[in-house]
């Protein structure tokens, strides 16, 4: 028989920097899960990723205090800001433009995000990323 699921925990954890401090410690501690076991497993799986890049993770907690976790791709906004070389998006996105990205950069971000996007094809994924960039006040060249 399958294990009984007692809950899901969704967190954004910096790659390679999981530690028992908040928000990880309290979230896992409430469910009685082994915090250090998660931190070691997460840090081991994110070794190849740029350190400090926030990685969304969904932890499935089981009744026997065991857990599994699934890592997602980094948020599109973080990847867009990194490509444009800015700290934050525009306060008035449709009037004040704060940066530029090219179609090639949109394509690269879409390839990175493709496992988590629901787009039918790569062109739709590129348009999704371009739309996110525009809503942050970033001009997309070539689209």
From Swiss-Prot:
Q: Which Gene3D superfamilies match?
A: Ribosomal protein L11, C-terminal domain, Ribosomal protein L11/L12, N-terminal domain
In terms of CDD domains, this protein maps to:
Ribosomal_L11
Which GO BP terms, alphabetically? translation
**Tagged with keyword RNA-binding:** yes
> Where does the secretion signal sit in this chain?
none
Q: Name one GO cellular component term.
A: cytosolic large ribosomal subunit
GO terms, molecular function? large ribosomal subunit rRNA binding; structural constituent of ribosome
Q: Which domain of life is it from?
A: Bacteria
Q: Do you know which InterPro entries this protein is assigned to?
A: Ribosomal_uL11 (IPR000911), Ribosomal_uL11_bac-typ (IPR006519), Ribosomal_uL11_C (IPR020783), Ribosomal_uL11_C_sf (IPR036769), Ribosomal_uL11_CS (IPR020785), Ribosomal_uL11_N (IPR020784), Ribosomal_uL11_N_sf (IPR036796)
Q: Which PROSITE patterns match?
A: RIBOSOMAL_L11
The entry's protein name is Large ribosomal subunit protein uL11
């Amino acid at each position: 028989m399958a294990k009984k699921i007692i809950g899901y925990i969704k967190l954004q954890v910096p790659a390679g920097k999981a530690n028992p401090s908040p928000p990880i410690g309290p979230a896992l501690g409430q469910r009685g899960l082994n915090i250090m076991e998660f931190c070691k497993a997460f840090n081991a799986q994110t070794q190849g990723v740029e350190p400090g890049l926030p990685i969304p993770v969904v932890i499935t907690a089981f009744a026997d205090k065991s857990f599994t976790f699934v890592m997602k791709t980094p948020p599109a906004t973080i990847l867009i800001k990194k490509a444009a070389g800015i700290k934050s998006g525009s306060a008035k996105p449709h009037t004040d433009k704060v940066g530029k990205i090219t179609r090639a950069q949109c394509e690269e971000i879409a390839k990175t995000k493709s496992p988590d996007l629901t787009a039918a094809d790569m062109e739709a994924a590129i348009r999704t990323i371009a739309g996110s960039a525009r809503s942050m006040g970033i001009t997309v060249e070539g689209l």
